[in-house]
Every structure is written in structure tokens, then in C-alpha cells.
Amino acid sequence: MTKVITRFAPSPTGMLHVGNIRVALLNWLYAKKHNGQFILRFDDTDLERSKQEYKDAIKDDLKFLNLHWDQTFNQLSRLSRYDEIKNLLLDKKRLYACYETPDELELKRKFQLSKGLPPMYDRASLNLTEEQTEKYIEQGRNPHYRFLVNHEPISWHDMIKGEIQYDGKALSDPIVIRADGSMTYMLCSVIDDIDYDITHIIRGEDHVSNTAIQIQMFEALNNTPTTFGHLSLIINKDEKISKRVGGFEITTLRKEIGIEAMAIASFFSLLGSSAQILPYKSMEKLINQFEISSFSKSPTIYQPKDLERLNHKLLISLDFDEVKDHLKEIDAEYIDENFWLSIRPNLQKLRDVKDWWEICHHTPNVESLNLDQEYLKQAAELLPQGAITKDSWSIWTKEITNITGRKGKELFLPLRLALTGRESGPEIADVLPLISREEIVKRLTSA
């Protein structure tokens, strides 16, 4: 049996977003499910936009998610190989030179659209005479090169969508070499997939038409096309996710919002499948449950709040032994097991544990806040008798309202400030049981 080899091929022109990472996850999981290999390739032939800082950030995000690669390379390191294939395809008459300027191509596109026609290249350059070609060269025009798509049916069995068919006549010949000599994604990708023995490619359904063309490229190079699977796109409020949608970058999720690696991995590896989205604690467990056949053909809706809820479920499921190393990573190694077990049900983000510790173990200095001391002392006297529980807050505030007439912010904010020293933070109903009765009274009467 052929060894399974998958790849993830980001362009280092920006940070990874949730759509990218879903593709990376599924390719990694598919490879590991079949005891195969996962290759990281950087499609960095766009010299103007590709940056080393993005390569470093992409690697950092993948490592954070435990998506370790077996091999990595950059397309820029393979330019001589691409030139070799370019010459081969020129000899086979599957590449041809074109001399239109970007402005001329844009005029053609607008004209076709004005006639209600799809914007397809008209193959005018195939009919250039030697004299016309020489004239363009004398004008200083550098040619770009297109791949000649055969006008015949193209079909393949997609791992997710099933049987797919295209008419080659409906596909425009793509530019594969720019006028400056740099290569575009289309042909380079096929050359790499052949040379690195890629067996399976899972990517977004916005690549389906590219796949149809690339199948002909495989065949033009006398190779059997790899097996493809096309995922439905992730959408948020009827828009597909892209690099330019703020708030959906992986670095934002992990560094600014504080989502755990396994919450991200669990969520996006199950999103769009028939499997229930659960907070898995390890990549091994995700591998065991992974089935590419479970993914739907329908668009996949991403709601950020769903990811945050899954993050909460993951945190409350973690025993102290499972989280103590993570606590060290956020400089919270002082958290002990008893405190973790007490505070765990209230956590939305792991970093919140530091706020809870500070609130529960340090009497806040609120002298500068000029709080209404008479009101706070009255509130202390109305504190319910007996053990402090989560129900104590609602009982207490109802009694305060009955006696003082205070409601809303006028009631809540002075109590929060006196008890925590902060205008916002964890729910006071959750904080109270973690502070002794004596400490609550002390904070209220000394404010």
C-alpha cells in the first residue's frame, strides 16, 4: 500500500486564520490516521508580499497546536526545478507565451463582463505571427506564460464531494509564469506534489476549479493526479473567512483572546463534520476519532462564541495534573490543586485563574476610590448568615434592595470595588464562596 503523504502549503503573505488552520489540521490528522507523513511547504514565489516574519509566525502557530511536520521546504529553493519543467511543457506545446499588458487584459475582462460572458482568456497569443512577436519584444514587453487547458471533460472522485466533473472549455488558461519570470501557485504546486510524492490533498472548495486544471497538469507531466478532498468554506454572517477578516487569526485567538491549543484543534477539526464537537484533551484522541468521510458538503458556519464555550468545557474537564504545566507557562505556578479545583468551574480562559487568585488572596487597596462607607457597612450587616454559597449573592442583593432601595450599578459597583478593587472581572456570585465570611466583612467595613 502506498504511504500516505499530505501537505499544508500556506503563502507567507499574512498570518494564519481559522480557515487555514482547519486545512492544516485535517491534512495532519489524515496523515497521522494512516501512519503517514505531513509536509509543510511555503508557497513563497510572490516575492513582493512573502515575508520571513510570516513564515516564522506560521511555524509558531503550528507548533502551538502540536501540528509537527515531518519535512518542510520553500518553493523559492526549487526555482531551477520549475525552469526544467517549464522547458518540458514548452516543448510539449502545453505552455505558451503571451504579451498582453495588465491594462490590456483588464480591458478584455471588462468587455466580456459587459457582454454577460465569463472572463476567460481568448487565446489571442496562440495566433501571434513571428513578426508580431518580434514587435512586442522590440517594445520591451516581457512575456508571461499560460498553461494550455485541453477542451475535454475533466473528472475525479473527491474525498468529500464525491464525483466532480468539469468541462475544459469552461476553464481559462491560467498564468503560470509572470512577466517578471516569477512562478505562480498553479504549476509549482503540481511539480512539488509530484516530486514529494503527495498522495492526498485536503483544501477549501474555492480551489475546485484549480484542481480541474491541475489534474491536466499532472497528466501533462505523465503523472497520476493525487487524491483531492474539498472542504466547504467556513463562513461568518454569510462571508467566507479570509486573512483580512479581523479577529479570526490564530495568533489573536491564542494570544489576545486566550483560547487553549486543544480547544482550537478540537473545534476546527470537527467543525463541518457529523461528529459532535467535544473538547478533546490530546491530539492522539483526535486522530482516533477522525474520519474524512464525516464532513459535509454544505457551508460551515463559524460562531466565535461556540469556540469560547468549548474552551470553557475543556478547562473545567482538566485535572490539576493535566494543567499544572500550562500554569507554569503563564507564570501561575503558585496555583495549587485545591484552588484549581475550586476555581475551575468559573474559568472562561486559563489566564483568568491569576485574577481569581489575586482577588481571593489579597485584600484590595481601595482608599483612593472614595467609596460610600456607610452603604458598605450596611451591606456587611445584611450579609446572609451561614455558609457562603453561590446563592448568597442573589439573596444578599435582594435584601440590600429591600432595605436601601438601591438597584443596578448603584448597588453592584460599590460592592464589586470594595471586594475586588476592580470595576470588572469574575462574577461576584462566584467570588464570594472563595472568600471567607470574615474576609468579606473586613473588605466591606475597611473600604
Curated annotation (Swiss-Prot):
Motif ('HIGH' region): 10-20
Key words of the record: Aminoacyl-tRNA synthetase, ATP-binding, Cytoplasm, Ligase, Nucleotide-binding, Protein biosynthesis
Residues spanning the signal sequence: none
Compartments (UniProt record): Cytoplasm
Family: Belongs to the class-I aminoacyl-tRNA synthetase family. Glutamate--tRNA ligase type 1 subfamily.
Native source organism of the sequence: Rickettsia akari (strain Hartford)
Single annotated GO MF: ATP binding
Motif ('KMSKS' region): 240-244
Protein's recorded name: Glutamate--tRNA ligase 1
